């Protein structure tokens, strides 16, 4: 078995008397699409923010390719190949779709303003165009991002995460607010990016999502969280057949 790309061990985070994450352990393998599900308040967002360097856990470690990155912030994690999207869109509404991707590619340069006004790297334009084509948003490439539908902006947001050739992409509720008709297309797109190295090395994904059909169809393995703890980890079929999960979360 391959060494894990991401390894989370004993992660804990409390807010006063509330244990948001209570000793979480899991691994993500190279090339794996790993889903995280659970009811509201199960600790998914706190876990996600810890992995992104947005908050500091109280205990435990986060390793990326064997390196302890627990104390690193978002910029340092991006430099090490971690891309991400959030529940709230991160697009620049007054900039064109193409310019949004070009700005995202320079995230490693520092602050938002230095990224916006830094001279572009050679080859970034071609990379942005390739992603625009892959995400099937070429017809709106020159439009301001704020003029697009929410679903189209979501695609731009995800495309921006791929401008740095990430080895690992963390997706926080990619289906939220997206037209149901676009959800299957989004799953197909993520599978293509997972399998096709044409735009860089093959990416792994950690996907936090409430849309159960999407998660079950897309992910290789799924982790179920309840009250800050891991209830189960397994394939979609194993999760479907887990009576403890059914009773606690999925229902009958």
Go through each PLM region and give its residues:
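Glycine-rich phosphate-binding loops of nucleotide-dependent enzymes
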Residues: 2-252
């Amino acid at each position: 078995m391959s060494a894990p790309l991401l390894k989370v061990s004993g992660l804990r985070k409390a807010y006063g008397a509330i244990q948001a994450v209570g000793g979480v352990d899991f691994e993500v393998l190279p090339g794996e699409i790993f889903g995280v599900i659970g009811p509201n308040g199960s600790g998914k967002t706190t876990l996600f923010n810890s992995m992104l360097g947005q908050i500091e856990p109280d205990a435990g470690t986060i390793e990326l390719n064997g390196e302890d990155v627990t104390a690193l912030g978002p910029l340092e994690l991006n430099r090490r190949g971690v891309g991400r999207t959030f529940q709230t869109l991160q697009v620049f509404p007054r900039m064109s779709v193409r310019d949004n991707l070009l700005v995202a590619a320079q995230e490693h340069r520092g602050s938002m303003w230095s990224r916006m006004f830094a001279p572009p790297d050679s080859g970034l334009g071609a990379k942005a165009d390739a992603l625009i084509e892959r995400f099937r948003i070429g017809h709106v490439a020159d439009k301001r991002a704020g003029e697009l539908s929410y679903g189209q902006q979501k695609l731009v947001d995800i495309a921006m995460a791929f401008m740095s050739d990430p080895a690992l992409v963390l997706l926080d509720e990619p289906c939220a607010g997206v037209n149901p008709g676009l959800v299957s297309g989004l799953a197909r797109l993520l599978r293509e990016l997972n399998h096709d190295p044409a735009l860089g090395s093959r990416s792994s994904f950690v996907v936090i999502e409430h849309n159960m059909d999407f998660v079950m169809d897309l992910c290789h393995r799924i982790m179920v969280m309840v009250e800050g703890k891991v209830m189960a980890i397994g394939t979609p079929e194993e999760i479907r057949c887990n009576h403890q999960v059914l009773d606690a979360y999925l229902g009958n």
